[in-house]
Amino acid sequence: DVSLIGFCSNYTLIINSLNAVLSKACNGLIATIGNYNLSVSKEDNYKMFNILFFLSFIVFSYCSIMLLFLVNPFISVWLGRDYLLNPLVVISLVLSFFTLLINTIPSSYRTTMGLFKETQNFPIIAAFINIFLSIVLAKLFGLSGIFFATSISRMLTYNVSDAYFVFKKGFGKCPIYYFQTLFIYFMIAFFGTVYIYIISLFIRIEGILGLFVKLIVYSISLLFYFLIIFYKTYIFKNTFRYIKGKLSNKN
């Protein structure tokens, strides 16, 4: 359906623009990570990885959840309700956005560690999985199935291989801890999405005012949710200590 593809392009324009901003910010990390790799021990490097991965999860899950609940209200204000996509398509688009970005830190570490040969075959594997799943899922879910296929193929290849070799060859550690953490983060993001969905049921304001109110309410609610989940954890305290130390050094 040509009109459906046209409607989808409005969403991908917004998502790709946000992705470009976030990717540009993250690209600056690669040189920093590379220099840090050379100046510290594997254990210190591993600790820094965990801090950066935690921070990236907070930023990317926040952006993804906000995108999920605000992109339709934004499109409605911008182009009108006639240009809105099925919620399942929106979910599939945002999931593809999230699975791409959540691998930023493992991918950056793999690059700076020079682990290229180990993952050279995975793009081909990912392409075959993507094609197969796209055919199957498109028949079941339509357009959203294609985006779900992209997310699944990416998770089964790039997201697995990058972290596996970074942990196995870069840190000399078992990668199972990373995958456990990734699963926990996914569940936290999922329940955060459910939490914001429940809140969204009580906000009936439409238009530009509604968009602004939703942005404020959802943002405060989601950041409060993350704080409640993480504030007693080791990774939160360690990250807070690191940021506080960096700010103190600047002063």
Regions found by a protein language model. Name each.
Residues 1-16, 84-88:
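Interfacial/gating helices of multi-pass transporter permease domains
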Residues 117, 124-159, 173-176, 194-216:
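Membrane-interface helix-loop junctions in multi-pass transport and translocation proteins
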Residues 11, 15-53, 107-112:
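Helix-loop junctions and terminal segments of transmembrane helices
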Residues 22, 46-100, 131-135, 139, ...:
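Alpha-helical transmembrane segments of multi-pass membrane transport and lipid-handling proteins
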Residues 196-251:
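Membrane-proximal transmembrane or re-entrant/amphipathic helices at the cytosolic face
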Residues 8-27, 59-63, 93-103, 157-160:
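Transmembrane helix-bundle signature of multi-pass secondary active exporters and lipid flippases
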Residues 94-126:
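Membrane-interface junctions at transmembrane-helix termini in multi-pass inner-membrane proteins
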Residues 12, 48, 53-68, 144-169, ...:
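Short alpha-helical transmembrane segments in multi-pass integral membrane proteins
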